[in-house]
Amino acid sequence: DRDSCVDKSRCQKYGPYGQCTDCCKKAGHTGGTCIYFKCKCGAESGR
């Protein structure tokens, strides 16, 4: 889920990050972005 992606995907302060995006996609989101070193998932896909 969204929170597990935050825990697994440490990242730079801002911008896209591969692990973050991949984690979010597996969780059913369209992708993810890094905000203040945390992975934030985008809108859910296919719902």
UniProtKB/Swiss-Prot annotation:
Keywords: Disulfide bond, Ion channel impairing toxin, Knottin, Neurotoxin, Potassium channel impairing toxin, Secreted, Toxin, Voltage-gated potassium channel impairing toxin
Cystine pairings recorded for this chain: 5-23, 11-34, 20-39, 24-41
SUPFAM superfamilies, per the entry: Scorpion toxin-like
Gene3D superfamilies, sorted: Knottin, scorpion toxin-like (3.30.30.10)
Parts of the chain that traverse the membrane: none
GO MF: potassium channel inhibitor activity; toxin activity
Expression (tissue specificity): Expressed by the venom gland.
Any one GO cellular component localisation term in the record: extracellular region
Chief location: secreted
Subcellular localization, as worded in the UniProt entry: Secreted
Residues in the signal sequence: none
Listed InterPro entries: Ergtoxin, Scorpion_toxin-like_sf
Family, similarity comment: Belongs to the ergtoxin family. Gamma-KTx 5 subfamily.
Comment block on domains: The presence of a 'disulfide through disulfide knot' structurally defines this protein as a knottin. Has the CSalpha/beta fold, which comprises one or two short alpha helices connected to anti-parallel beta-sheets stabilized by three or four disulfide bonds.
Function (record text): Reversibly blocks Kv11/ERG potassium channels.
Annotated protein name in UniProt: Potassium channel toxin gamma-KTx 5.2
